[in-house]
From Swiss-Prot:
Name of the molecule in the record: Osteocalcin
Gla domain ranges (all copies): 53-93
Signal peptide positions (record): 1-18
Keyword Aminoacyl-tRNA synthetase included in the entry's annotation: no
Lineage, top ranks: Eukaryota, Metazoa, Chordata, Craniata, Vertebrata
GO cellular component: a single term: extracellular region
Homology family: Belongs to the osteocalcin/matrix Gla protein family.
Propeptide residues according to the Swiss-Prot or TrEMBL record: 19-52
Residues that bear 4-carboxyglutamate: 63, 67, 70
Gene Ontology BP, a term: regulation of cellular response to insulin stimulus
Length: 97
């Protein structure tokens, strides 16, 4: 049993040594670390999603904002003069949807 364990350890050591030697022989041009931190625009756009402009709110969403804003008299007054979106944004922050 000890002989089997010794042979397994020796074979693992041999595999590790040969795999380290094969990875060290790559040319410098294939190393991604040498490319730097800048990438082309088309490659970067595949990784980072662009923010989209907010779409049009539906009547149900606007009614929901109106119901929240009606509970505050100042918000309700601003809603009548400036509009529901401006009033909600001023008193409650960005629209959640």
């Amino acid at each position: 049993m000890k002989t089997l364990a010794f042979l397994v350890l020796c074979s693992l050591a041999a595999i590790c040594l040969t795999s380290d030697a094969s990875t060290g022989s790559q040319p410098a041009s294939d190393n991604p670390a040498d490319e730097g931190m800048f990438v082309e625009r088309d490659q970067a756009s595949a990784v980072v999603r662009q923010k989209r402009a907010a779409g049009q709110l539906s009547l149900t969403q606007l009614e929901s904002l109106r119901e929240v804003c009606e509970l505050n008299l100042a918000c309700e007054h601003m809603m009548d003069t400036e509009g529901i979106i401006a009033a909600y944004t001023a008193y409650y922050g960005p629209i959640p949807y």
